[in-house]
Amino acid sequence: MKVTKPNWVEHTVGEKKAKTAIYSISVHPDGTRLATGGLDHKVKIWSTLPILDVEAEKEEENPKLLCTMSSHTGSVLSVRWAHHGRFLATGSDDQVIMIWGLDPDGGGRLWGSDEINVENWKALTRLVGHVADVVDLAWSRDDTMLASVGLDSTVWIWDGLTFERLRKLDLHQGFVKGVCWDPVGNYLATQSDDKTVKIWNTEDWSLAETISKPFETSPQSTFFRRLSWSPDGAFIAASNAMNGPVFVAAVIDREGWASDISFVGHENTIQVAAFNPRLFFPEGEPKGRATASSMLALGANDFSISIWRNTLYKPLVVLKDIFGADLMDLCWSNDGYVLYGSSVDGSVCAIQFEPSEFTDLADFSATELVLREYDYKPKRAHQPLAVHSSAASITNGFGPSTTTSTHVNVLQPKKGKAKRRVDLSNGNINAGPSAGPSRQALRPPPPVDPFSGPIQGFASPSTAQASTARMFEDAHRAFGPGSGSISGTSPRAGDKRKASGSYEDPTRGVRGRGMPVQQPIQQFEVQIIRAPMVAPSPSDAGPSKAYLPYPQVQSILRAQAIGNESRSIYLEARNTSDPKGENVLCYFADGEQRWMDYLPKAALAVTVTKNFCAAACEDGSLRVYSPAGRLILNMKLSGLVYDLQGEDKMLLIITMDCQVRVINVRNGKAFSPPSSIHHLLFPGSSSFHSFDIISCTVRPNGVPVIITSEPQAFAYDASLHEWSTIASPPIAGIQPLPSGPSGPLSVVDQIVAKSAPVTTTEKSNAPWIEESYVMSQFEMKLRGTVLLDSKEEHKHWLLGYMKYLGDENFAERAGEVMKDLIGPVYHQSKPTGWEPKLLGVDKREIAAEVLDVLSKTLQGKNVASVWYDVLDKMKADEGSW
């Protein structure tokens, strides 16, 4: 065993370059790079060669510091390499997760610093969801998912390829300070200051178990509670546990989640546990679960590290006072021979073992063999809670379509919205929404693994580096707004996100006097300037008053609309970071600026259609303009705007206080009074359990549609002044209704279906449950198509409903439907409230079509015969007049 503490691995602050805390450390899967995150807001990547080899350290041609990344605006609390080595995830107390990728063509001097980047790791995207410090990160073993935890008491699950949000878990009641994945793939474990470890089932993200006994008396003073899962999936080692007055690491057994065993010996709280990724087997014995053992490293606030085998009652080695302050993080190299640690004192250590010391260490094939014994096959499809574009199809007026969109908003940053996917297997970019009619194009890449193999050494480009270069270029295009197919619900951009746009300059007609010209920015960087100056007061937030996440002020917002005759229309808001500067709103059409205006405060959201454009500012003001630049509406809202969406002449506004408004811009009137969606997002009396908005749109008839991560879809019913459910996930064990024709409701159905967790629950034995479910689904769809003003879909579901009623002999229900369609048979002295038309079609014409379907069913013939007679008599009476 050899212990190395390189004094040149450091994070520094101030003019005197004083060493500062290194909160997290992670070694690359190929063992050549070490990533560190510190109090200086920076992420640094170091070469491990001069750390592990004294002779190599002396040679100047061996670089030590490979790259410094400084996009975070807060302390970097967690750094984690993906197992394939292509991505580095970092979490910070700026509430942001950054995903970094290697640009093989990069390098050079770091801006504002003397540091030279040998490699150029750039931010591919930023993940926004946490509203407090991001404390820990973990990649699933197959890298299909990334988990993050933070001081907002939430756990976020992200897609490991597209980085869309899959799920938010919010059952912890305290800061969540540690996370790890089950190597088998069945579970996720999280540890919190609420003195529990929670086990989550990855099939449906239900809570499988809560373990609290070992932590009942544990102190809440630790910065982290980093736990680790053994490579054979048999145990979890949880930090900061207590056994009476003794500081221990608790061992949680996978079988029954018992926690009777613990590792004892440290003199202060244990902050981090880290299992060696390799398994150990006695020589000469068959390799399997029964003979496998594992190695565990523990780091504590007594400034020491201990290394254990689960088959022994005492540690293999204890390194006392290896640091001068609390230990923050530990990680093992993939070969199992090197353990790295970091500390608040600003130093790192490398503990290197020789193969002769670990004679029973096995290769990864043995681990695979053990994990296969669990015979676990994931039933879930790793699909994100897809967010639909609000770009309206010309054919149906709602949601994405293969036809030309009515409008497309680009680079209007909103949390939890549609993202473009990058297919890293072939370099293709799918720019459409992540669910809906075009979903087929967004499936995961074929089985050939684009991430196989490590990133090669520094000396010469390799095939792996070329693959990384292509990945970096693809991701650059995907995370920038190079296409006009990203909707106004696209996610917030990173600290810096490059974008490009082409503006045609066709022959222009003669117009009158225009405004001073500013050119649209062809290449630009979107930067987070600051938080809004006006935000909901935390003191106002409580069980009955919860707020949506507030947006950040960005340097540039851009929205695009594609109108008739392929006219190119852009709206661009340019926010200034200079207190004395001006915030400018520019409108471009056909490749040139038509007008501009100065905003009173920085813009938080913009949207544009062929009929109007709108900008919401951080002072709560909302300004709506005509295409010629007339200020049509200038309103002061009750709160900051969370989202803006436009459709035809309708403007949808969602504010941070969960209020939804729809305004008819053409006549300047509200579609209905403001309505709250608080009860849709924060059900019950507690705001700790909440749902997210994964899609929000407005129909041309003014009806807003909200889809939540429950998942449920709601449309506002102006006649009731309430939200009506128009789509819900299927019931376990019952076959859902076949899909209907394309239209707004079918788009909503697809989002909800793909957002619903996969369940293996058996069908209920309750009597008539299937019939009840089928009829309620038909009836919900009928109401939904009326609210969404979808004539073709309504006809399809009405005829299907009547056929089902006839086949199953539900004569009374069929009779009620016919009575509503045909209306009063005789003249009524008092108004009955019966409307003769439905979706613009005469109800009695609809009745005739319905009767044709009903008459062809075995049980519905008699009902149809009665109503045929009524309809014929009414037609005869009308003819006699």
From Swiss-Prot:
Residues 398-409, 459-468 have a biased composition (Polar residues). GO terms for biological process: chromatin remodeling; DNA-templated transcription; regulation of DNA-templated transcription. Signal peptide: none annotated. Keywords: Chromatin regulator, Nucleus, Repeat, Repressor, Transcription, Transcription regulation, WD repeat. WD repeats lie at residues 17-56, 71-110, 129-168, 171-210, 219-262, 265-318, 322-363, 588-635, 688-733. The keyword Transcription regulation applies. InterPro entries: CAF1B_HIR1_beta-prop (IPR055410), HIR1-like (IPR031120), HIRA-like_C (IPR011494), WD40/YVTN_repeat-like_dom_sf (IPR015943), WD40_repeat_dom_sf (IPR036322), WD40_rpt (IPR001680). It comes from the Eukaryota. One of its GO terms (molecular function) is nucleosome binding. Transmembrane segments: none annotated. SUPFAM superfamilies: WD40 repeat-like. It is found in: Nucleus. GO terms for cellular component: chromatin; HIR complex; nucleus. Residues 398-514 are annotated as: Disordered. Required for replication-independent chromatin assembly and for the periodic repression of histone gene transcription during the cell cycle. Belongs to the WD repeat HIR1 family. This is Protein HIR1.
